Curated annotation (Swiss-Prot):
Glycoprotein recorded as keyword: no
Protein name: Large ribosomal subunit protein bL28
GO cellular component entries: ribonucleoprotein complex; ribosome
InterPro entries named among the record's database cross-references: Bacterial_rp_bL28 (IPR050096), Ribosomal_bL28 (IPR026569), Ribosomal_bL28/bL31-like_sf (IPR034704), Ribosomal_bL28_bact-type (IPR001383), Ribosomal_bL28_sf (IPR037147)
Pfam families to which the protein is assigned, alphabetical: Ribosomal_L28
Any one GO biological process: translation
Family that this chain belongs to: Belongs to the bacterial ribosomal protein bL28 family.
Gene3D superfamilies registered for this protein in UniProt: Ribosomal protein L28/L24
Example of a GO MF term: structural constituent of ribosome
Organism of origin: Acidothermus cellulolyticus (strain ATCC 43068 / DSM 8971 / 11B)
Length: 62
């Protein structure tokens, strides 16, 4: 499943994991994506991928 929010488009962030000895390896931070049944239009429900910040902000009607 793609780590992208269908509401805001938030995707993974990329960076480096830095150890104590300063060795650097690539890593990614995925957003907290939940698969929810959301109300789309008039009485139509659809399963979409939504990040938890959009859920908390009330951007999705469940």
């Amino acid at each position: 499943m793609a780590a992208v929010c269908d509401i805001c488009g938030k995707g993974p962030g990329f960076g480096m994991a830095v150890s104590h000895s300063h060795r650097r390896t690539h890593r990614r931070w995925n957003p907290n994506i939940q698969r929810v049944r959301a109300l789309i239009g008039r009485g139509t429900y659809k399963r979409i991928n939504v990040c938890t910040s959009c859920l908390k902000a009330g951007k999705v009607t469940r």
